[in-house]
Amino acid sequence: KDLGLFNEAIESYEWAISYGPKYAIAHINLASIYSSYDLEKALHHYQEAISIEPNFPEAHYSLGTVLSSLGQKDESMKSYEKALELRSDYVEAHNALSTIKKYKKNDPQIKQMKNLLKQTNLMLSDKISLNFALAKVSEDLENHKDFFKFLNEGNHLNKEKLNYSIDSDLEGISNIRNIFINSKGGAPKSNLKKGMPRPIFIVGMPRSGTSLVEQIISSHTEVYGAGELDFLSRSILKEIHTEVYGAGELDFLSKNVLKEIKPDNIKKIDSKEFFEKITNNYYRSLSSFNISEDIFTDKMPLNFRFIGFILSAFPEAKIVHLKRDPIATCWSIYKHYFKSNGNGYASNFDDLSSYYLMYKGLMDFWHKTFPNQIYDISYEDLTLSQEKETRKLLNYCDLSWDDRCLNFHKNTRAVHTTSGFQVREKMYQGSSEAWRKYEQYLEPLISKIGDAK
């Protein structure tokens, strides 16, 4: 599973269940794979686990995450609450519930979370989760001082946990440019074989509107919305690591491949074969989705790093790039809990502003290298002129008009991001101005990227 070999993992778990149908953990592990692309099967296996062990809090919590992805807010809350009823110190359930619940002053859960945070033996990850949850509580109660107290502490601890260094990301991006420049020119004209769906890659900074645009495009009858896939970065990093070091598949997962690449190593990369392997690896992972539509979306925002590789390995691909007000984007990133090191820059304003400026510089590079091959769409323009911008977007994607794309909020597909419930609502305006009421707290960010349009 960790290698992206989902079909093989599914076979292993199904084999375990065939020999022990009352093995709750196997049902949960199988459901965790299906939750990425087949929620009906995920629901089935989580419910099976609960029927086997009804007092299994982790199963109720996991069921809640699937229900949340399906937009079933009330049912999701009930599952999280059941998990907390069974285990009141279940911090992940507290945090998950906080993201979808609107708090009032005397909610007993608030006291529970504050008491948990006082414990001296609390794991670092639990401290982070509780600080972000209590920040959300403070935001709901409009207590700005406590909001920033908990938010700043949560981000500070998260940076400590991830041991993140912005220099590592900046060096990695520099190496991406060099690898691409060295390998450019050897790409095949087309790697798309008969029966393969054509990709639309939706990229940009997190919290810039990528989930909204995927929801719009995937509402079209010819499009399958695959969500945030890590297949591309896995494929690229695996092949870079293999070309340079010749090591097996497991090694690249434990290394910062992009940072470790040296200029002399880059020259080892054989362009044509390199891009063909990226394509083949990507579609091998994608095969577990059993996509019947002709087109699919991949909306991993940070794929903006690899646009040159995408257009070389997938010449038929469309690239949709979301642009949003820089302060609105970075503020929204800062107030959300990102657990992976890939978003480690989110944890303080200095790193966040440096990363944003790096992103902007890299996008300028891709635009110059691939003129007229990257479609920029403004989040603000989309919210102000929904139909006009949707028509332009579909036209770029070579899709005919479909009224369902205007009624994207009725789309029942799974959404696994923090924007999951927002994209099930009608288009609304003004979210890019929400940061202004916290302006006094955001001066370090504003001074660095306020003019980075």
Name each model feature, range by range.
Residues 1-2, 25-35, 58-65, 92-99:
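Conserved alpha-helical positions within TPR/SEL1-like repeat arrays
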Residues 95, 202-204, 215, 295-301, ...:
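Short beta-strand segments
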Residues 2-15, 25, 35-48, 69-82, ...:
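Structural signature of tandem alpha-helical TPR/SEL1-like repeats
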Residues 190-239, 245-312, 322:
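Phosphate-binding active sites in nucleotide-utilizing proteins
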Residues 98, 110-121, 125, 131-199, ...:
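PAPS-dependent sulfotransferases, especially Golgi type II membrane carbohydrate sulfotransferases
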